[in-house]
């Protein structure tokens, strides 16, 4: 896996646009509140206006993404692949939505408080690695921040131990706290709750 990661990094380093996206201020920590709930974010690459203009000059097709912005928030993702993900109750979903990166972008954007474009610099774990520069459109971020505003107090209540979480059966918390109370047929394992 170390060799695979090295190969993926080498692949990304060969691409000028990818490297420009990752050339901003690194690991910028910001704190703030959403609906009275504290949040802390760590931005992988915070681009300033000069870097954005340099990108648009070298890569004119990016002009629609950057517009006249004063910067951009870039999050680097090292992922299995960038293909749509099957969600049993929904169907095929873009990987960005399946793994909540759009929600993450909405939080980052709100905490940064400048509403800069939110971009993903994705590298896959495939061999050879695939790279992608992706944007999450503002209407999608706006919809997600409404979701965060509505749910933040509930999650804060869970975090403080005041509310018992609703179990989904598949998340990290559920796997860690699972208690067996039945024996099930292997053929139905995960049919209802599993999303892949």
Regions found by a protein language model. Name each.
Residues 2-3, 39, 68, 98-102:
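Alpha-helix initiation and capping sites
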Residues 30-34, 47-49, 122-124:
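Short acidic, glycine-rich loop/turn motifs
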Residues 95-196:
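Metal-dependent nuclease catalytic regions and adjoining charged, substrate-binding loops involved
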Residues 21-23, 69-71, 115:
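Sequence-level motif detector for i,i+2 pairs with an aromatic at +2
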Residues 38-40, 69-71, 129-133:
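Short, mixed charged/polar active-site loops
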Residues 31, 79-81, 125-127:
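Short, solvent-exposed loop/turn segments at secondary-structure junctions
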Residues 1-43, 166-172:
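Metal-dependent nuclease catalytic cores that hydrolyze phosphodiester bonds in DNA/RNA
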Residues 41-92, 108:
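Conserved catalytic cores of phosphodiester-cleaving nucleases, focusing on short active-site segments
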């Amino acid at each position: 896996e170390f060799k695979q990661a090295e190969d993926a990094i080498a692949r990304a380093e060969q691409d000028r646009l990818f490297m420009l996206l990752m050339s901003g201020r690194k690991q910028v920590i910001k704190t703030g509140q959403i609906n009275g709930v504290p949040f802390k974010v760590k931005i992988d690459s915070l681009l300033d206006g000069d870097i954005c203009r340099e990108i648009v000059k070298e890569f004119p097709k990016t002009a629609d993404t950057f517009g006249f912005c004063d910067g951009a928030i870039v999050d680097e993702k090292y992922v299995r692949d960038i293909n749509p993900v099957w969600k049993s109750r929904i169907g095929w979903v873009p990987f960005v939505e399946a793994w909540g990166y759009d929600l993450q972008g909405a939080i980052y954007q709100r905490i940064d408080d400048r509403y800069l474009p939110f971009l993903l610099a994705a590298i896959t774990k495939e061999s050879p690695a695939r790279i992608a520069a992706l944007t999450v459109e503002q209407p999608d971020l706006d919809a997600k921040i409404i979701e965060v505003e509505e749910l933040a107090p509930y999650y804060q209540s869970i975090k403080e131990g005041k509310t018992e979480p609703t179990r989904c059966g598949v998340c990290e918390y559920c796997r860690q706290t699972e208690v067996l109370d039945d024996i099930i047929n292997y053929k139905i394992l995960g049919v209802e709750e599993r999303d892949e």
